């Protein structure tokens, strides 16, 4: 493959999105559209990528900071198109930043689903000497530039929809907005562009007729999958591509043997907070019920079962673990781990730094954050464990909490092995509960407790016989 530079068109306003966010920063699978296209550039091992910005340029450029070479080795540059005078004008702004040799591929920043294999085939069709166009046949080509062919089926020109006559509008083969151009020819063709058309713009597509006039072969690489070249101009189109993308990811998982209760109700997304790409690694016999969302990098061990409507981010679920419905596991940057055979939920919440051992039970409305629970520990109802180290076989009662924050600093609670914590207890950190000990229900523990003992810290019960409740006073 010849040396490759890429221009990405990202100057459009996206008026139909009705959003303050620039169109190319709208998210698909948790990642901005433009990031998907930059990923395509990385897959082609591009030498240099030039992003043409316009509306929201500052935001777009900031959103791409640090992405140069992500998954590849390209040099990332930005140029601004002000004002926006058409696609040809946009490429004119970018060419000074290119090396001037090899092949230049032009991509659209709002076309996120083009496959790397498709782009490689397009580049090969151009071979550094021909002008290669990526085309597709559409049942309703309204709004797209038509591919006009001459005798023998050779491409003669592209005519934009607004400039097309009735015969040309009947053509169903359309230009996708993606092309591969011999770099040494590009500057000369751009210099000959005019804006003598219905839009009063400089069309990049006019270089096709110039190539024909100059005797440069024009190749059309026509694909059958229109979703690969579908752009985003409205929330409805974004939703359509989101579902197409998620269906493809679901299909790939099922090919690996994962049981999805309903592939139409499965989502895998990037994590914008940690920067982790959406990736799910599944062992054999994994089952995922409906409505689950996976964010960032998630590993599911052999026989793991995920109940309906769970949200799992940056976490590892070990073999045989069961996550019951409506559970939220969010490892964020610190990660979260659920051990083999553990039972989680329903309605449980594991936060960053939650590390659960084998056969741990975390029940409904229990929250665990930055805490380690050793094998066999249980917190089955309505409890909070934050900044805690919990030993083996601990039973942590309903309504109990670790008071880990003093208003300025976090402190740890240590609960040693075989401890029984009664219901509605408060463990005020820093504090250690000795091995085998018991804390009586309703206690507020502020000091370390000895191993094997019973610790009770609560007001003494007082019962008053024959006590009369206050009576309501008569009104008026």
From Swiss-Prot:
GO biological process annotation, one example: cell morphogenesis
Catalytic site: 381 (proton acceptor)
Principal EC category: transferase
Binding positions for acetyl-CoA per the UniProt entry: 398, 404-405, 423, 441, 458
Residues reported in the UniProt entry to bind UDP-N-acetyl-alpha-D-glucosamine: 23, 81, 86-87, 108-110, 145, 160, 233, 351, 369, 384, 395
Region (Pyrophosphorylase): 1-235
A family per Pfam: NTP_transf_3
Reaction catalyzed: alpha-D-glucosamine 1-phosphate + acetyl-CoA = N-acetyl-alpha-D-glucosamine 1-phosphate + CoA + H(+); N-acetyl-alpha-D-glucosamine 1-phosphate + UTP + H(+) = UDP-N-acetyl-alpha-D-glucosamine + diphosphate
Acyltransferase as UniProt keyword: yes
GO cellular component, one term: cytoplasm
First-listed, main subcellular location of the protein, grouped into a coarse class: cytoplasm
Stretch list, region N-acetyltransferase: 257-476
Record pathway: Nucleotide-sugar biosynthesis; UDP-N-acetyl-alpha-D-glucosamine biosynthesis; N-acetyl-alpha-D-glucosamine 1-phosphate from alpha-D-glucosamine 6-phosphate (route II): step 2/2; Nucleotide-sugar biosynthesis; UDP-N-acetyl-alpha-D-glucosamine biosynthesis; UDP-N-acetyl-alpha-D-glucosamine from N-acetyl-alpha-D-glucosamine 1-phosphate: step 1/1; Bacterial outer membrane biogenesis; LPS lipid A biosynthesis
Binding site for Mg(2+): 110, 233
Keywords: Acyltransferase, Cell shape, Cell wall biogenesis/degradation, Cytoplasm, Magnesium, Metal-binding, Multifunctional enzyme, Nucleotidyltransferase, Peptidoglycan synthesis, Repeat, Transferase
Location within or outside the cell: Cytoplasm
GO molecular function, one term: UDP-N-acetylglucosamine diphosphorylase activity
EC numbers: 2.7.7.23, 2.3.1.157
Cofactor: binding comment: Binds 1 Mg(2+) ion per subunit.
The protein's required cofactors: Mg(2+)
Annotated region (Linker), positions in chain: 236-256
PANTHER family: BIFUNCTIONAL PROTEIN GLMU, NUCLEOTIDYL TRANSFERASE
Quaternary structure (record): Homotrimer.
General function of this protein: Catalyzes the last two sequential reactions in the de novo biosynthetic pathway for UDP-N-acetylglucosamine (UDP-GlcNAc). The C-terminal domain catalyzes the transfer of acetyl group from acetyl coenzyme A to glucosamine-1-phosphate (GlcN-1-P) to produce N-acetylglucosamine-1-phosphate (GlcNAc-1-P), which is converted into UDP-GlcNAc by the transfer of uridine 5-monophosphate (from uridine 5-triphosphate), a reaction catalyzed by the N-terminal domain.
Record-stated family: In the N-terminal section; belongs to the N-acetylglucosamine-1-phosphate uridyltransferase family.
Protein name per its UniProtKB record: Bifunctional protein GlmU
Organism, as annotated: Acidovorax ebreus (strain TPSY) (Diaphorobacter sp. (strain TPSY))
Gene: glmU
